Structures are given as structure tokens and as C-alpha cells.
Amino acid sequence: MRQTVTGAIGAGFAVGRPAIVALLQRKWARELDYRLIKELWAFTGNRIAVRFAYEWHDDSGNWFRSYGNENWHYNDAGLMEYRYGLPNDLSIKESDRKYHWDCSGPRPADHSSLTDLGL
């Protein structure tokens, strides 16, 4: 499996499960109190496109909202074979945050969508 990775953790490719796990561990160690919303954009056959926005802060307390799109391609076994994503990190004030649910659990089912939030 190949996964394209770009953004805050640097451009590059992670190939194979161990490399992807290591990449995600580095990402999540940097992006603290991470909260994510994705919306389906399009799908056909074994491909899905979503748009996303997530909020997080670094270890200095600086807040960010990261926006972008992801394209997913699944193999015949139903496993993700390719993931292409490009987040754009925007520095925000803590008072401009829109995601306030407890990040130790999933986003509440009644939480506003990206469209509802104007994102």
C-alpha cells in the first residue's frame, strides 16, 4: 500500500503499514487536541473524495485549522491502496476555534458539519 502524505509533517511518501504507522505517530505527537470533520465530496467505483478541516495546537499553544481534500482508492479486498491528501495549515486564535467537543471521544452526532460551519 502506498500513501501520499504532505503538509505539516513534510512532503513525501509512506509505503507499507509500518511506515504509515510511524508517520501518523509523528503527526499526532505534533498536532495536539486534534479534532476533525470530513465531508463526502464525491465517489465512484472504488474511489472516494472528501474535504476536511481539523483544528489542533502545537506544544507552544499555537492553534491551527487545517483544510484540504483527500482522495482515496480502494483495492479489491476493500483496503485503502492509495491516499492522496494536501492539508493547508492556517494559524488561528484560540477564540476562533469552532470545534469544542471533548477530543478523547468521537465528534458528537449532532455537531455542525463543515457546510453548516461555513468551512
Question: Which role does the model predict for each range below?
Answer:
Residues M1-I48:
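A solvent-exposed, acidic/Ser-Thr-rich amphipathic alpha-helical stretch
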Residues G7-A8, V50, M80-R83:
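Short hydrophobic/aromatic-rich beta-strand segments that constitute the beta-sheet cores
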Residues W41-R47, H73-M80:
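A short, structured loop/turn motif at beta-sheet edges
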Residues Y84-L119:
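Low-complexity, intrinsically disordered terminal/linker segments enriched in charged
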Residues A29-D33, W56-R65:
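Short, cysteine-centered beta-strand-loop-beta hairpins and adjacent loop/turn segments enriched
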Residues Y34-I37, R51, W63-E70, R83:
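Short, surface-exposed coil-to-beta transition loops
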Residues H57-D59, Y74-A77, N88-L90:
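Short coil/turn motifs at secondary-structure junctions
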Residues T4-V5, R51-H57:
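Generic short beta-strand segments
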